[in-house]
UniProtKB/Swiss-Prot annotation:
Family: Belongs to the SRP9 family.
Source organism per UniProt: Dictyostelium discoideum (Social amoeba)
Superkingdom: Eukaryota
UniProt-recorded name of the protein: Signal recognition particle 9 kDa protein
Cellular component, GO annotation: signal recognition particle, endoplasmic reticulum targeting
Complex formation: Heterodimer with srp14; binds RNA as heterodimer. Component of a signal recognition particle complex that consists of a 7SL RNA molecule and six protein subunits: srp72, srp68, srp54, srp19, srp14 and srp9.
InterPro entries per the UniProt record, alphabetical: Signal_recog_particle_SRP9/14, SRP9, SRP9-like, SRP9_dom
GO molecular function list: 7S RNA binding
Main location: cytoplasm
Localization (cell): Cytoplasm
Database matches in Gene3D superfamilies: Signal recognition particle alu RNA binding heterodimer, srp9/1
Summary of the function given for this chain in its UniProt record: Component of the signal recognition particle (SRP) complex, a ribonucleoprotein complex that mediates the cotranslational targeting of secretory and membrane proteins to the endoplasmic reticulum (ER). Srp9 together with srp14 and the Alu portion of the SRP RNA, constitutes the elongation arrest domain of SRP. The complex of srp9 and srp14 is required for SRP RNA binding.
Leader sequence segment: none
Keywords: Cytoplasm, Ribonucleoprotein, RNA-binding, Signal recognition particle
Length: 75
């Protein structure tokens, strides 16, 4: 499911990781033809996706990457 709001995607991603940290993973890919970045967080049961083509949103990739790095080093 695509989530339109960044804050909602960020919060749900964190909740998903805290619920099942061993199975949750984060990935992103750039679709050159469309000029969009797609962020995906999944635990194989729940899939969260956020896509954007705005440059301001590209900076958020670093924000969520930092979140997952911080969460994995907490344990």
């Amino acid at each position: 499911m695509y989530i339109e709001d960044w804050d909602e995607f960020y919060d749900k991603s964190e909740q998903l990781y805290r619920t099942d940290p061993k199975r949750t993973r984060f990935s992103f890919k750039f679709r050159h033809v469309e000029g969009k970045v797609v962020l995906k967080v999944t635990n194989d049961t729940v899939n969260l996706k956020f896509q954007t083509d705005k440059e301001n949103d590209f900076k958020r990739i670093d924000q969520i990457n930092s979140l997952f790095f911080r969460l994995t080093t907490e344990q």
